């Protein structure tokens, strides 16, 4: 999903100044997360603003305010421009902060926090700093994200994330130690015979029975499954 811009049904993402482009991970999370009952939403590491705009579209009939924070200055400027060109500029606010700084200054408590966080920990790092920030955990570790959730979630609020399998298991263990419990989980397989590559999770402060499902993206190369199409049809132009 490269290129300088990506068009969705109700908004366009320009991304020539963003380190991380529109991808399947962010699109999946934005389409899957439960927005019902949320009035205040926080998108941590918004990048292009994709997830914030997807949630704004999904909550168009509701009174929902969305804050989006992004540490990289160029990405935050472009995300703000993407928001300003959308129909939801009155409800989505983009701020150029690290989540560590935002925790210190934020007075709100959120009903929903979402993040498509970086997950490379011990891999070689790209030369460009912006790419490093976007892809590596140095600037948004699992501990940072969980600390933000513990401090900024309301008592009934939820945290929604997407991680590769190993990191997802580690994240869930750390979350439980801090009193955040997985109540909804989606295992994502690229194709039927390929193992799970991504896990989406919703966590809350209340321990509830786990709802677990599996989503397969493609039947074969370039042929999406009906389940995936159902999930993203409100966004992808093709459907």
UniProtKB/Swiss-Prot annotation:
Pfam families: MTS. The keyword Methyltransferase applies. One of its GO terms (molecular function) is tRNA (adenine-N6)-methyltransferase activity. Keywords: Cytoplasm, Methyltransferase, S-adenosyl-L-methionine, Transferase, tRNA processing. One of its GO terms (cellular component) is cytoplasm. PROSITE patterns: N6_MTASE. It catalyses: adenosine(37) in tRNA1(Val) + S-adenosyl-L-methionine = N(6)-methyladenosine(37) in tRNA1(Val) + S-adenosyl-L-homocysteine + H(+). It is found in: Cytoplasm. It is an enzyme of class 2 (transferase). Its main location: cytoplasm. GO terms for biological process: methylation; tRNA processing. Its EC number is 2.1.1.223. Belongs to the methyltransferase superfamily. tRNA (adenine-N(6)-)-methyltransferase family. Specifically methylates the adenine in position 37 of tRNA(1)(Val) (anticodon cmo5UAC). HAMAP family: tRNA_methyltr_YfiC. This is tRNA1(Val) (adenine(37)-N6)-methyltransferase. It comes from Trichodesmium erythraeum (strain IMS101).
């Amino acid at each position: 999903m490269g290129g300088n811009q990506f068009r969705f049904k109700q908004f366009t993402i320009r991304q020539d100044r963003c380190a991380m482009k529109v991808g399947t991970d962010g699109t999946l999370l934005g389409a899957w997360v439960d927005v019902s009952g949320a009035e205040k939403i926080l998108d941590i590491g918004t990048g292009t603003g994709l997830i914030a705009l997807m949630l704004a579209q999904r909550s168009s009939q509701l009174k929902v305010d969305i804050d989006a924070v992004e540490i990289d200055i160029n990405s935050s400027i472009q995300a703000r421009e993407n928001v300003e060109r959308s129909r939801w500029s009155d409800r989505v606010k983009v701020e150029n902060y690290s989540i560590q700084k935002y925790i210190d200054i934020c007075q709100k408590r959120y009903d929903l926090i979402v993040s498509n966080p970086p997950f490379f920990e011990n891999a070689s790092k790209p030369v460009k700093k912006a790419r490093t920030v976007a892809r590596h955990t140095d600037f948004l570790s699992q501990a940072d994200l969980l600390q933000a959730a513990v401090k900024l979630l309301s008592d009934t609020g939820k945290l929604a994330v997407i991680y590769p399998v190993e990191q997802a298991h580690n994240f869930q263990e750390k979350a439980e130690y801090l009193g955040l419990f997985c109540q909804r989980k989606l295992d994502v397989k690229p194709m039927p015979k390929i193992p799970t590559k991504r896990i989406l999770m919703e966590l809350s402060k209340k321990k509830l029975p786990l709802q677990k499902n599996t989503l397969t993206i493609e039947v074969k190369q370039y042929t999406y499954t009906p389940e995936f199409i159902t999930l993203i049809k409100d966004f992808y132009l093709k459907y």
